[in-house]
Swiss-Prot record:
Transmembrane residue ranges: 18-38, 64-84, 85-104, 128-148, 176-196, 219-239
Annotated region (Disordered), positions in chain: 246-287, 1561-1604
The protein's assembly and partners: Part of the Tic complex.
Function: Involved in protein precursor import into chloroplasts. May be part of an intermediate translocation complex acting as a protein-conducting channel at the inner envelope.
Membrane topology: Multi-pass membrane protein
GO cellular component: chloroplast inner membrane
Presence of keyword Transport: yes
Record-linked Pfam families: Ycf1
UniProt record similarity statement: Belongs to the TIC214 family.
Protein name: Protein TIC 214
Keyword Cell inner membrane applies: no
Compositionally biased intervals (Basic and acidic residues): 266-275, 1575-1595
Subcellular location: Plastid, Chloroplast inner membrane
């Protein structure tokens, strides 16, 4: 088994080694590169598909493989890589090849035309074709990685190359892997090509296949061309790209030193030194700057010329050295006269320009390597002129020592590596033996251990001295910083900003006060001041290192130009030459004066020696202006050492900046692409020079036309904004734009997420589906309750959507016209043509035709009315966006920018004119329709590019008139018909009367005929009619009528005529009677059946219902039988003992009332009480706690019988809990009730009666409803307390029992009797804790006892949460939730969070905990149970002097905090003697280090906003003086005697608190006089006072108008906005639109003479807003804000926070200022302020713990200086004793090896007794990963710690110091 496992292990290790070997990895990466198929494969496929022969296929494959092999070799072979990687090299190779390829393709046509070639020439041509195929595949394989973009897979080999040691083997194996992949790809391609001819569908179309094969070459050429054009369109060619304007060198020299990055040297040379410097060359400068040899020779010639000059010659020599391959040139002052200075410079610059044109190499001309080729955005810094190159991260690989080992750094500084290589080459004795890796590491470990040991010993020794309690040595034991002094005697240091020995957050910004213009403007000052100012400023620039956050003003401007020389000469004219000559003989040797030489000695600089040295520098250029000669005394060089910052050599601007800078000059094409915009001129002021008669010259000089223009931006998507012109577009993949105007780019993968794609934009699929299914199912939609309201809402919504859709359509149409070439000119000409046709041809023709028609119809013509309306129509020319100009003035550049034509008062042709009265009514209806815009088709539109509106028809009034006339004709016709009908009725009446006397004659005639029938029937035979009746019978008798009919017919023929008539008559009568009887019987039978069925159905239904009801009742009775029997027995039990309980409760009540009277007489309780106030729950609690083995609860109800209590605040959980505490009934009485989780169904009245007997609520109460104790009740209670509104993740992170203690637990209101039995064991523990505090007078013991108590029982924390659930209704006396239920008169019991407390207890105003719930809060959650917070939402004080803040707060919180309100017990001392003011314990006296801008809205005026969110996060550090005192600096709020009183009470109050005590004590006497009184009246007074003081903003301003002027108000608001808030003022959006509409009308009115009609019509149409016109010109800023014209909105800014600020924030968020809450941690400052408080002065209130014998630092390492501290932490962090010689640090990856490592958020911290010290150790550990980040920042070339954000809190060991 062992052998097998050994073999198996060896086999596994062998497999791992094989997989990790270089060969296998190379094969894998090479195989992956096969999938990077690019355009180079097109030639390979072309040879295979076109089937041009085996030779071409072989040549194509060979060329393809050869090209790929060269690419792999170029990775390893540097010259080949450089040759293939340089763009100009590849371009030089490709261009001739493409030219040859073009002629080669055309040669075939030439040879086919001539037909003179022989067989040999054809063979040669075929051979050349094979070679051409080889070259195509070879070259395009090389070009794939450079001209055309390569994929990630092709770059994998390059990436892994840097990790591989055996590079050649890796390259070979990767090539073999690629070859294998290529072979498989070609085999697959051959199978596909073999399958294509075998397919039946392809074989059936042989003609198409042959055509496709013949055109295959053309198809491949087209595909290749499209691919190249596509990629070249993204990456423009360097030759074709736009050439940017480079800053000329003369321009750079004339501007600033910063733009050109020059190193300026001011020198006065000796001949010897010049000779030495001419022969010396700086190798580093020559290597870096690449000076031309001709330039060097030119410099030598200039220096030789300088040697020939005399010693008295005055010479300025300016040397400008340009970096980054910029040519080096020199400008010399060749003439001695200052007047020829500019002339000499111009000549030299001109020569230099002409020289540079011929000197510029061809490569730089074709390929500008300084320009942008990538899609970079030109991020310009306003503090610099030229943009800085973003070249911080230079990927340069070099080996460097790291953690004791040689490692490859990919961002090693190139200059440093070059310098090290130069040193190794220069120093031949560099023979130091290189240690092995292990030896090097061991040496590094040893040195680190030694450093750590020494520093730890030093730290321990300092700590031991501090523990000896010698105050005199405390200052000495603190390690101090090294500072640079100005004066040793006065101990004046340099400012932290200027001190080079300090770094980090102390390095501030330097503001330059003196520039060239300032110096020139100060010529009138004295000479000494001028000299001192000039040269001190110069030395100031040399000495101090400038930060990036200041605006550079280089010193070249100070020495460059004639004005500066004149200034120097004037300033030195009154100073004698001898004085400077004598002073110049000073023995200082400052030949090479620099910053490093000053700071190396680290000594103080004497001011006197500074002055002498400065004067000594001046005597080199002393000038006597009388004889105009110069004196050269000594050669002194002052060199500026500046860091070379790589900058772009281009100064690019966008369109707006170009217009601003070049208003008078001719504007050039800007270099940056800005948002597409057009400048639309809306007004031109040409009237300013109309009255003056001037010449042409004066006109050209003075007649500057003023133009008012608007900028019209394009509404289409702008993806190219701020991109430099000529740079390639962003290579975005998987993004498509299918719309013409698309705001955002979308990926094709997310088309289903978009509402409407471009395929289905015309209709909605869901709507169609709903319609189909609705019709299919034939179901009508159900009626809704608020159907009408929803319909109106839907209509409004649809109207808005339609309006927005129309707006989008109009924008799309306008942008379409604006993007198409020459579209604006075509559209403009069409509009002008339509305007002319409408105005002068169509409308006059219609007027003429109408009036002629009226004349032909014999009506009066309306020439005057029509012509008047026609003349009234105005065709106003507008800009493209609708700004009106005039009828005759066209917009500027309207052919390119576009034009609109607006028709005012459009003419409408009418067949006739109405009277004036009726026309006025119609005008009012159509006042908004008296303008329109002309379309290109001559139609009228409401808006530009809108849909044409429906025009009124000419014939419509005619049709209406004809309809009216037809109606009249119809009316007349109907009248005639009515008359005819009436007459017809009369005629019929007469006819009826006539028929009345004819009827008797007829009857008589019938009677006579009957008589004749009796006498002679044969006589009337011919007159009779024979009728055969067939009776209607059922189907059974269907055959019978037929038989009867036949028989009857036979009988009729043969029988006697006399007997027939009688028989027939009898049969007819019989049949009629039979049918009638039968029908009646059937009808009666049907009716009877219906009645019987209805009755039976109703009976069945009633029976079923009764059965179901009985069944349900029976089931319910069975289910509830147990509880019913219990309740029945309990009801009998209660009724029996009801009287007994009532009598017993009355007796006990009387006993306790008498006892209470006796207690009130004593001095134990001195409570302020209200006679009409009953603390309901507290009385219950006290009476219950004072009753031993009692069976009832006693209520202490006052004598007022009109009190009603709202039981909505009492939950059923609380009632059940109280009931369960009764010993008699707990086991039996309400056991079933307590088991039921809801309101008990059958015992509601019983429970109410029981509660009344127990005194839980009054018998007269109207509110007897008891809430349910469901889980939802608990959730609702949590929702009411909005500090519990947390996310699920935060809830899981919380420890619920700790957080419940944190938020809800307060101090106890102690009971009167020391022997009283408390409600539960938790309250006993709290009382013991307070008793322990009282005995020891040490408030620090609270935390220690709390921590010990936490370890007693683990289930205690969970019981606490359940206990709170059971007792959350008891909100007064419970230590968990101490809130009062106070009733005044008939006032209902209200839910109140605010508690009446003693002196040391203050208000808990809850805040949202989810804003400050971070990791720091959860660590010490239950340490301080009584954290005090203050709600800054109530900080809306009025602006006046004497503010009764305490009374104001009492009124707002609905309680009263009285000074005389005390809480004492028999054995317990009161907790605090000092009454702290509410603003003191909040901790707002700290100095605010920054202004909160997380949500920066105004917090001083209540109408703006209150700084609530920022206060919620850090309630203890908000400076209250920023809220109030700084705004009232002109008011004397406090008095000094009040400060003295408070200082006597509390000698430990800090100096910052005095201001607040002044604020408090202004009304202290008034508050003391209040004493005890009626709480209700006090509350009423306070509320009234609060109402009086809390005025609105406008009332406050009215009040201030009496005291201050208008300017003071504006200054105050400006002060408020600028200093304390980061805000900006902007226009309201609606006001902005109204202003634009007014401007459009103003542009037209300015061009009109008579504006009355246009103004009135514009106001009627709503185009002109009168409220905007009423805005005053000099309106105050406050009034503009008040009226809503200006809106204050925040500015989102970024704050850079220093190290101290981060410390202060970290501790300030997590800790509450305990010395201001309860006086626990009152500090005593025994440390000297000059030394210690200078460093930690603002944080010392958080450092002390109140113990006189011990001073608690954050961590003991604070004894050391920050630099030493950081070094110690880094050495400890290395943990070198546990390391092995491995490649990784186990401290960062193996948590088990870390000592004292714990989880970051641990529920139970094993800490010392003093949690405060533990917490600070947690916050400031012994080492931090941030320190490593700071140490290694240069290894990574990054300026921030963003790379270490994930590992920032990886491990924080707590107590390891050494």
């Amino acid at each position: 088994m062992i052998f097998k496992s050994f073999l198996l292990g060896n086999l596994l290790s062998l497999c791992i080694k094989i997989i990790n070997s270089v060969v296998v990895v190379g094969l894998y990466y090479g195989f992956l590169t096969t999938f990077s198929i690019g355009p180079s494969y097109l030639f390979l496929l072309r040879a295979r598909v076109m089937e041009e022969g085996t030779e071409k296929e072989v040549s194509a494959t060979t060329g393809f493989i050869t090209g790929q092999l060269m690419m792999f070799i170029s990775i390893y072979y540097a010259p080949l890589h450089l040759a293939l990687g340089r763009p100009h090299t590849m371009t030089v190779l490709v261009l001739p090849y493409l030219l040859f390829h073009f002629f080669w393709k055309n040669q075939k046509n030439f040879t086919s035309i001539r037909n003179a070639s022989t067989r040999d020439s054809m063979c040669n041509l075929r051979n050349l074709n094979i070679q051409c195929v080889f070259l195509n595949n070879l070259i395009f394989q090389l070009l794939n990685h450079f001209i055309l973009p390569s994929s990630t897979l092709a770059r994998l080999v390059n990436i892994y190359m840097f990790r591989c040691n055996n590079k050649m083997l890796f390259v070979t194996s990767s090539f073999v892997g690629w070859l294998i992949g290529h072979f498989l790809f070609m085999k697959w391609l051959g199978l596909v090509l073999f399958w294509i001819p075998q397919n039946y569908s392809i074989r059936s179309n042989k003609y198409l296949v042959s055509e496709l094969r013949n055109s295959m070459g053309r198809i491949f050429s087209i595909l290749l061309f499209i691919t190249c054009v596509y990629y070249l369109g993204r990456m423009p060619s360097p030759i074709v790209t736009k050439k940017l304007k480079e800053i000329s060198e003369t321009e750079e020299g004339g501007e600033s030193e910063e733009e050109s990055n020059v190193e300026t040297t001011f020198e006065t040379r000796d001949p010897k030194q010049e000779q030495e410097e001419s022969t010396e060359e700086d190798p580093y400068l020559c290597w870096e700057e690449k000076e031309d040899p001709e330039k060097i020779d030119e410099r030598k010639e200039i220096q030789v010329n300088e040697k020939e000059k005399t010693k008295n010659e005055f010479d300025f020599h300016f040397k400008e050295t340009y970096y980054k391959d910029n040519p080096v040139h020199e400008d010399s002052y060749l003439d001695t006269y200052q007047d020829n200075w500019q002339l000499g410079r111009l000549k030299e610059d001109k020569k230099q320009k002409t020289y540079l044109i011929y000197k510029k190499p061809l490569v730089n001309f074709l390929f500008d390597y300084k320009r942008w080729n990538r899609p970079l955005r030109y991020i310009k810094n306003d503090r610099f002129e030229n943009v800085v190159r973003n070249e911080i991260s230079q990927y340069f690989f070099y080996t460097c020592p790291s953690d004791g080992k040689k490692r490859i750094s990919f961002t090693y500084p190139l200059s440093l590596s070059t310098l090290s290589e130069m040193i190794e080459r220069k120093i031949f004795l560099y023979t130091t033996e290189k240690l092995s890796h292990e030896g090097l590491y061991n040496y590094w470990v040893y040195t680190n251990e030694q450093k750590k040991y020494n520093m730890s010993n030093e730290l321990l020794s300092r700590i031991k001295v501090l523990e000896k309690e010698k105050k005199s040595l405390v200052i000495d034991m603190l390690e101090k910083r090294t500072r640079l002094y100005n004066d040793e005697n006065e101990q004046k240091c340099l400012h932290k900003t200027y001190d080079p020995l300090l770094n980090g957050p102390y390095r501030g910004t330097i503001k330059k006060l003196y520039s060239k213009n300032d110096l020139i403007s100060n010529r009138n000052r004295t000479t000494e001041d001028a000299i001192e100012t000039f040269w001190i400023n110069k030395i100031h620039d040399i000495l101090y290192i400038y930060n990036d956050s200041r605006k550079f003003e280089h010193q070249k401007n100070l020495l460059d130009g004639e004005s500066v020389l004149n200034f120097i000469g004037n300033s030195l004219s009154s100073i004698s030459i001898g004085k400077f000559y004598l002073e110049s003989t000073h023995s200082f040797n400052l030949k090479k004066f620099s910053l490093l030489s000053l700071l190396a000695e680290q000594k103080t600089i004497d001011l006197e020696s500074q002055a002498k040295s400065l004067k000594f520098r001046i005597d080199g250029i002393t000038t006597d202006l009388n004889d105009e000669t110069t004196i050269r005394n000594k050669s002194i060089g002052i060199e500026e050492i500046l860091k070379k910052v790589p900058r772009w050599s281009y100064k690019l601007t966008n369109g707006l900046e170009e217009e601003d800078e070049n208003e008078e000059e001719s504007t050039e094409d800007p270099g940056l692409r800005s948002r597409k915009a057009k400048r639309v001129v809306i007004y031109t002021d040409n009237d300013q020079n109309t009255n003056s008669i001037t010449t042409n010259n004066s006109i050209s000089n003075n007649d500057e036309v003023e133009e008012v223009a608007l900028i019209r931006y394009s509404q289409q998507s702008d993806f190219r904004r701020d991109i430099i012109k000529g740079s390639m577009r962003a290579q975005r993949r998987k993004t498509v734009t299918w719309e013409m105007f698309q705001a955002n780019m979308h990926s094709a993968l997310f088309l289903d997420r978009i509402d409407k794609t471009f395929f289905f934009s015309s209709f909605d699929i869901s709507e169609m589906r709903n319609i189909i299914f609705r019709n299919w199912l034939r179901r009508e939609p159900e009626l809704r309750i608020s159907e009408c309201e929803e319909e109106t809402k839907e209509k409004g919504k649809k109207y808005k959507e339609k309006k927005e859709e129309n707006k989008r359509i109009r924008i799309a149409i306008s942008e379409t016209w604006d993007t198409i070439i020459f579209a604006q000119a075509i559209r403009g000409s069409m509009l002008i043509t339509q305007s002319f046709l409408r105005k002068y041809i169509i409308l006059p023709s219609l007027i003429i035709a109408k009036n002629i028609g009226r004349i032909l119809l014999f009506q009066f013509p309306e020439w005057d009315e029509d012509l008047k309306e026609w003349n009234r129509e105005m065709h106003v020319k507008c800009t493209y966006n609708g700004v009106q100009l005039s009828e005759t003035e066209f917009p500027k550049d309207w052919l390119t920018d576009g034009i609109q034509i607006k028709i005012l008062f459009p003419f409408c042709l009418k067949p006739w004119r109405k009277p004036k009265v009726r026309s006025n009514l119609t005008k009012k209806k159509r006042k908004k329709e008296n303008f329109c815009f002309l379309t290109i088709w001559g139609m009228e539109a409401e808006l530009p590019f809108g849909s044409p509106r429906k025009q009124s028809s000419f014939f419509e009034p005619i049709y209406k008139e004809l309809e009216k006339k037809m109606r009249k004709v119809k009316k007349k016709f109907f009248r005639v018909l009515r008359v005819f009908k009436e007459r017809k009725k009369g005629f019929l009446k007469v006819r009826k009367e006539k028929t009345g006397w004819i009827l008797p004659i007829v009857l008589i005639r019938k009677q006579i005929m009957k008589e004749f029938e009796k006498i002679n029937p044969i006589f009337l035979f011919k007159l009779s009619k024979v009728k055969v009746y067939e009776p209607h019978e059922k189907k059974k008798n269907d055959k019978t009528p037929n038989k009867i009919t036949r028989e009857s017919s036979i009988q009729i023929r043969s029988m006697n005529w006399t007997n027939y008539s009688l028989i027939e008559k009898k049969m007819k009568d019989l049949a009629d009677r039979t049918l009638t009887t039968r029908n009646q019987i059937e009808q009666i039978t049907k009716d009877n059946k219906k009645i019987a069925i209805i009755c039976d159905g109703k009976r069945l239904e009633s029976r079923k219902k009764i059965f179901q009801i009985l069944k349900r009742q029976y089931i319910r009775l069975l289910r509830k039988s147990d509880s019913f029997m219990k309740s029945f027995i309990e009801k009998i039990y209660i009724n029996i003992f009801l009287c007994t309980i009532n009598i017993f409760s009355i007796n006990i009540q009387l006993f306790f009332e008498s006892k209470k009277k006796n207690l009130n007489k004593s001095t134990i309780y001195n409570d302020e009480t209200n006679q009409n106030t009953m603390n309901f729950i507290s009385t219950l609690k006290k009476s219950f706690s004072n009753t031993i083995n009692s069976t009832t609860l006693i209520t202490n109800i006052s004598n007022n019988s009109n009190i009603y209590y709202n039981l909505s605040s009492l939950s059923q959980a609380y009632v059940f809990y109280i009931l369960s505490q009764t010993q008699l009934f707990n086991k039996y009485h309400l056991r079933s009730v307590l088991h039921y989780d809801r309101t008990y169904p059958f015992l509601r009245d019983t429970i109410k009666n029981y509660c009344m007997t127990q005194g839980i609520f009054d018998t007269k109460s109207r509110y007897k409803k008891i809430h349910k104790s469901e889980i939802n009740e608990w959730k609702n209670w949590l929702r009411d307390h909005y500090q519990y509104k947390l996310s699920q993740t935060k809830w899981f992170r919380l420890v619920p029992q700790k957080w419940g203690n944190k938020v809800n637990k307060h101090y106890i209101i102690q009971n009167k009797d020391k022997d009283s039995i408390k409600l539960d064991s938790y309250k006993k523990e709290k009382d013991q804790l307070i008793h322990y505090m009282k005995q020891n007078h040490n408030y620090d013991a609270v935390d220690s006892l709390t921590s010990q108590k936490e370890k007693l029982k683990k289930h205690y924390r969970y019981d606490l949460l359940s206990h709170e659930y059971m007792n959350y209704g008891n909100r007064e006396d419970s230590y968990i939730y101490e809130s009062t239920l106070q009733v005044n008169g008939n006032q209902e019991i209200s839910y109140n969070l605010y508690t009446m407390k003693a002196e040391s207890y203050y208000i808990l105003i809850t805040i949202v905990i989810n804003d400050y719930l971070e990791e720091g809060y959860i660590v010490d959650m239950d340490q301080n149970m009584n954290r005090k917070y203050f709600d800054s939402r109530i900080l809306c004080f009025p602006i006046r002097k004497n503010i009764d803040i305490e009374a104001w707060i009492n009124a707002h919180i609905d309680t009263k905090i009285n000074k005389n309100l005390k809480t004492e017990t028999n054995n317990y001392q009161k907790l605090a003697k000092k009454k702290l003011f509410v603003f003191d314990w909040i901790g707002m006296n700290e100095e605010r280090l920054y202004h909160k801008i997380s949500n920066p809205e105004p917090w001083f005026f209540p109408e703006f906003w209150l700084l609530f969110n920022a206060y919620k996060i850090k309630p203890q550090i908000i400076p209250i003086q920023l809220l109030f005192l700084n705004f009232y600096f002109y008011e004397n709020i406090s008095q000094s005697n009040n400060i003295n009183l408070d200082q006597k009470k509390n000698p430990h109050i800090s100096s910052n608190q005095k201001e607040y005590l002044e604020f408090e004590n202004s009304n202290q006497e008034k508050n003391e006089q209040q004493g005890q009184g009626d709480l209700r009246s006090d509350l009423r007074k306070q509320k009234k006072k609060d109402v009086e003081e809390n005025h609105t903003k406008s009332e406050i301003k009215k009040h201030k108008k009496k005291k201050q002027s208008k300017s003071n108000k504006e200054a105050e608001l400006y002060f408020f906005l600028k200093k304390y808030l980061l805000f900006q003022l902007r226009w309201d959006d609606s006001l902005n639109q109204r202003m634009i509409d007014n401007i459009k009308v103003y542009c037209l009115l300015l061009r009109l003479i008579n504006t009355k009609e246009i103004v009135i019509s514009s106001i009627q149409r709503g185009e002109m807003c009168l409220d905007v016109m009423l805005i005053q010109k000099d309106l105050a800023l406050t009034e503009l804000i008040k009226k809503g014209i200006l809106i204050i909105e925040p500015i989102r800014l970024f704050l850079e926070r220093g190290v101290k600020l981060i410390i202060y924030q970290t501790i300030g968020i997590s800790l509450i200022n305990k010395n201001q809450t309860n006086g626990k941690y009152l500090k005593k400052r025994y440390v000297d302020k000059k030394s210690f408080d200078r460093y930690i002065g603002r944080y010392n209130n958080m450092l002390a713990n109140g113990d006189k014998n011990h001073y608690d630092f954050f961590v003991p390492e604070n004894i050391l200086s920050p630099r030493r501290r950081r070094e110690l932490r880094i050495l400890i962090c290395f943990n070198s004793c546990n390391w092995n010689v491995v490649d990784r640090n186990p401290a960062f990856c193996n948590e088990n090896k870390i000592k004292n490592y714990r989880q970051f958020l641990n529920k139970h911290l094993n800490t010392d007794t003093n949690k405060f010290t533990k917490f600070k150790l947690f916050l400031w550990p012994n080492y931090r990963l941030e320190d490593l980040a700071c140490m290694n920042r240069y290894w990574f070339d990054t300026n921030n710690g963003s790379r270490f954000s994930m590992s920032r809190i990886h491990m924080y060991p707590r107590f390891r110091i050494i």
